[in-house]
Structure formats: structure tokens, C-alpha cells
Amino acid sequence: MNVFGMLRVKNEARWIERVIESIWPVCDCIFVFDDHSDDGTPDLCESLGAVVYPSPFEGIHEARDKDYLLQKVWEIAEAGDWCLMVDGDEALYEPDIPAVERAIESAAVCCSLHIVYLWDREDQIRVDRWYREFRRPSLFKLTQRNLSFMRTTFGGNLHCSSAPIQLLSSITPIPARLLHYGYLYRNDRVRKYHFYNTIDPNNAFEDRYRHMVIGDLFPAASAFKWAGPLELKPLAAS
């Protein structure tokens, strides 16, 4: 049995080294789909031992890109192998590696990990409401060759999950955390807020992404649909 790391990335040079190094202990191979990065991300990935596939596509379509990468995995994988799919700014928390290893040896087929949002400092996380317990399916077993990622109604086919749609009806939560660095700094949070509202405008379900910038563009005391007022605590207490 092999475990394949999977990443779909664009311009993640700041974080990619720690991300790839964090998942190597549980992976036999790491495959990266690079979406036209111009900051050296592909070279960094290759220097860390990952196999990089430059995007042959134009435009944003997350599910299409993930399907393409999964087909590349299938070129050498077999049914019964596993995949760990993380973003280019998410690192597997080292103390939780044994939980991932146990899950791979279990009867589960799809496992969710706790996404921990680092906020303002690397030793501090956001914990108000949705942010406290947010989990995402990221570890899955290759059960059949027709696995694919779901199509959504959101712009850019955002929010298509990190596990194939065929496995989302049987999700096992495991005590493992991914440290999310992409919201660590205010400038990045504001940039992401404007990016999401540009490619996925007027998304009422996501409350127009206002939760991302509570304490930045909106007062810290704001209470919106998914989050707020802003609450932070030490990573060590998570």
C-alpha cells in the first residue's frame, strides 16, 4: 500500500517547503498540480522531491484541476492506496502524524482533519464559532477509478472538497490537525477576501466571505453568519 500526497497550488513559495516536509513522513510520493505560479513554487516543490504537473488549463476550476491530478496519481497507484490532499499553505501538525498513520491502517475510506487557522502569530489560532471545529475531508482511499471531485455552484468551482464526491457519504473524523498559514497575516486575509468576492461574488451562503476579515475590515466585535466576535487562543491549547 502506498500513500500519495496531493497538492493544487499557485504561488505558495512562502509556505510550500514546510507544507511538503510536513507530509513526507506519511507519504510515499507527492504529486503537485501547479496553477501557473510565477514565484518559483514549482522549482521548490521539485527540489523537495515532489512530482510537479504544470496546469494545461486556463481559468479557475478547482474540481477540474483536482480530477486531472488524481488521474496522474492513478497512473502509478492501485486500488487500496491512499491520498492525503492538502492546500499549499496547510502543514500537517507533527504531533498528529500517528493519527494519520492509524487512519490509513483502519477500515475507513475517507477521513476529515481539523483545519486550524493560524492568526496574527504562528502560535495563535482563531476559535470563534465556525473556526473552532472546522474539519475537511482530506485523507481518502482509492476505492475505484471513477473517483472525481464534485462540481459546485460557486465561482471557480470553489469549495469542491479535498476528497472525491463518491466518498463524502462516509467520513470518519480523526484527531489530526492541518495548520493553515494562509490567514496568518492581515494583508493576506484582506487580499483573499477581495479575491473570493471577485471570482465568487454575492455568495449568500458564505455571507460574502465577511467572516474572513473580522478584526481587519470589520470590527472585532462583529457577529456574522458563520463567525464572530473574533476570538483567539494559543495553538498549544488546541
What are these regions (language model features)?
Residues 2-4:
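Cell-envelope/extracellular polymer assembly enzymes that use nucleotide-activated donors
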